[in-house]
């Protein structure tokens, strides 16, 4: 009976995280056998330049926008404002360009804004050239 009385009168113990003797639990996610990143294996070949045909290196950068993806607006010519002369040039009024909306540049039509041929929605095809 004395043993049960001493158990009920003891103060509550601190949480297990505050005890120095509590074991530390660490959980790790299981490693998947299938990686998201694929590895590419390459094989070394002999450096035989005579067997290789010299191919012309084609630039994939867009020639119209020079790889920028945007060209100067054709409507406002890069001003951002379409200006109109009134009273024989004495008064000039302008409104925001409707094509570029004042940004002074529009997307390149050749590369569709990608900056290189064969990007995004381009219809560039190697076999056609």
Curated annotation (Swiss-Prot):
Q: Which residues bind Zn(2+) 1?
A: 62, 65, 108, 111
User: What tissues is it present in?
Assistant: Expressed in shoot tissues, in both bundle sheath and mesophyll cells.
Zinc finger region(s), CR-type: 49-123
The keyword Chloroplast is assigned to this record? yes
A GO molecular-function term, please? protein folding chaperone
User: What GO biological process terms does the UniProt entry carry, in alphabetical order?
Assistant: chaperone-mediated protein folding; ribulose bisphosphate carboxylase complex assembly
Q: Which InterPro entries match?
A: HSP_DnaJ_Cys-rich_dom_sf
Instruction: State the source organism's domain of life.
Output: Eukaryota
Q: Which SUPFAM superfamilies match?
A: DnaJ/Hsp40 cysteine-rich domain
Pfam families attached to this UniProt entry: BSD2_CRD
Which keywords describe this protein according to UniProt? Answer: Chaperone, Chloroplast, Metal-binding, Plastid, Repeat, Transit peptide, Zinc, Zinc-finger
Q: Where in the cell is it found?
A: Plastid, Chloroplast stroma
Any GO CC annotation of this UniProt entry? protein folding chaperone complex
Disruption-associated phenotype: Mu-active bsd2-m1 mutants are specifically disrupted C4 differentiation in bundle sheath cells with reduced levels of bundle sheath cell-specific photosynthetic enzymes and aberrant bundle sheath chloroplast structure and altered RuBisCo complex formation. Ectopic accumulation of RuBisCo large subunit (RbcL) in mesophyll cells.
Q: Which residues bind Zn(2+) 3?
A: 68, 105
Cite the residue span of the transit peptide: 1-43
Q: What positions does the entry give for Zn(2+) 2 binding?
A: 73, 76, 97, 100
PANTHER family associated with the record: PLASTID TRANSCRIPTIONALLY ACTIVE PROTEIN (PTHR15852), PROTEIN BUNDLE SHEATH DEFECTIVE 2, CHLOROPLASTIC (PTHR15852:SF51)
Record's function text:
Chloroplast chaperone required for RuBisCo complex biogenesis and translational regulation of the RuBisCo large subunit (RbcL). Stabilizes an end-state assembly intermediate of eight RbcL subunits until the small subunits (RBCSs) become available to produce a complete stable RuBisCo complex containing eight small and eight large subunits. Involved in the differentiation of bundle sheath cells, especially chloroplast structure.
Family according to the record: Belongs to the BSD2 chaperone family.
Record note on quaternary structure: Interacts with the RuBisCo large subunit (RbcL) assembled as an intermediate complex made of eight RbcL and eight BSD2 subunits.
Q: Name it.
A: Protein BUNDLE SHEATH DEFECTIVE 2, chloroplastic
Q: Which organism is it from?
A: Zea mays (Maize)
Q: Which gene encodes it?
A: BSD2
């Amino acid at each position: 009976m004395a043993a049960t009385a001493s158990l009920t009168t003891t103060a509550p113990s601190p949480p297990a995280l505050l005890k120095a003797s509590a074991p530390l639990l660490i959980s790790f996610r299981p490693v998947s056998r299938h990686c998201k990143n694929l590895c590419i294996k390459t094989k070394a070949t002999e450096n035989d330049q005579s067997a290789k045909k010299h191919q012309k290196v084609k630039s994939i950068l867009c020639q119209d926008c020079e790889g920028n993806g945007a060209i100067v607006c054709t409507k406002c010519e890069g001003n951002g404002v379409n200006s109109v002369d009134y009273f024989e040039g004495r008064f000039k009024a302008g409104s925001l360009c409707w094509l570029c909306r004042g940004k002074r540049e529009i997307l390149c039509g050749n590369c569709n804004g990608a900056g290189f041929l064969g990007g995004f929605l381009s219809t560039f095809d190697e076999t056609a050239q």
